[in-house]
Amino acid sequence: VISPNTRLPSAIALCFAGILLATSIHAQIPDAHQGETTFTQPPFDDADCTSNGQYRAHRYDVIIVGAGLAGLSAAKELQHLGRSVLILEANNRIGGRAYVGFIGDNKVPIDYGGAWIHGVPTNPLTGLVDSMGFIRQRTELNLPYFINGRQAGNEEKKVFDHALEEYEDAVTLAARSVENQRALAEHACSEYKSHVPRKEICRDLQRRIPFSKISVLSDLCQGPVRSPGQFCRTTEKALRVTSDVAERYVPQSGEFKDIIPLLIANAGPLESAAELRKTSAVDGAHFEAGEDDLIDKGIGTFVEKLGEGLPVCRNSPVTEVNYSGDGVKVSAGDKVFEGANALVTVSVGVLKKKKIAFRPELPKRKLQAIDTLQMGNMQKVIVPLNRDIFPNEPKNAWALYEGDLPAEALTFAKKQHLPLVNGTRVVMGFVIKPLNQNIAIGFFGGDWARTLEQRCDNLEHGSGKSNPKCDDLSIAITRSALSNMSGEKEIDEAIQADGIQVTRWSLDATSFGAYSVAEPGSWHEREVLAEPVKGPNGIKRLFFAGEGTAREIYNGSYPGAYESGLKAARDIHATMLETEEKAREAGRLGSTEK
């Protein structure tokens, strides 16, 4: 159950990609292929998934929770290393958030989830996709902008590009700023522990950073005396969070006034799936993007093909992982599966909802990471068209739109306190003619996506055919935007209304959102989430992977999911080799003593 909706192909974009063949990534992951075992994967059939009561037919080396990209890549690597695996998947299909719907009369495969391979030259999935026979199509990023419902002219586009460049440069410098703030916090902490008077420490901090910008520091220095631990934790977090708010780096020059809403939406909700003020600058700065390609049959189809032949128990939502003994027991309904290790690859959203109980409870730092990381939201409205309403635009074109809302949508937006431009306008993203087909895909991100999706709560439980009872506003806004963008006054005649499909990832019980988001000051929690957990005997038994655990350059993405699965597989194998060697050594010592 992995990878999310779609980080869009803007300058700091998102997708889900992975790592199998890329030497640039391989070089950074320790090679665990030495000392491979000769163990053969036990025979697998559906009976392995349907046994009632205590399941004891096989004790697998690894039970993998989730058949998304991370789980599948881990399973393939573990089998390659000679380890036996069983994958438990809550859904009736594999792929997680890599999932294709078939749109319009031509049944065009369009991804409900992530659609792009970002940073094609360095993306580890590029070669794998090509080798498996899929055809890539380049996305046109010289995007048209629509301001107040009209297409921006060349000069306005230049202004936007200039502002975007300034923002990206500033965010890149943010990582350095955060490190400076961390060093400042460590210095203050050291002095406090050395009994330097609090007033003196605070005076030094005030000289460097005005407390007006960091209210927590003001409270810390003027409130009750704290223990050294409290003082250090609060100071470090306050400084780190303040310098890591992505919205701080939006250029404020007057020449950018008209395009700032587009920039904020493009860098925030339409990319990170969260409002820019809730987004980590460091997380965004480190993400690697570049040239962006779609896949002819969809990434969902690619991931499904990648998982062919793997032992997967579908319709098996895991409810408990017990790692208290010599191995693990993983419960799915009334079935209990046994293994030496467990690899959990579910989304941050599933972990936050506590859908899986862990016995014993996870360490506090792991729980803190789960609590701190968030799930972003991205809704797609996929509209099949009867004809090409954008004859002057290239295929696979990415567009930004800002325009007035229909009356009923405006009333709703104000009631829900959703972000508006000048009190009446919304900002959306669009992909025009994906895969060179007469289709338009509208994107709502962040608060807009979450609020629109929640209108379908109790009516829908995932993505698919539009529901007129609850998707009406999403469709009305998209229809209005398409009319303004194309100049088609009779837009309804161009739309195949019965074929519209809508994504609702926040309502999907296998994800509870599009993809993970690191809020300001919490980018490092991804690394904590990825840490393995030891059982009572001191041996690592419980492992984690998925886009939420990815390195900063792949945060929340397909390559992050894929790489994390591969890395976890190698970590598991290395741990087992060490354990097996100790057992052999103990056996040798025992025979010698005899």
Regions found by a protein language model. Name each.
Residues 8-17, 24-594:
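FAD-dinucleotide binding site
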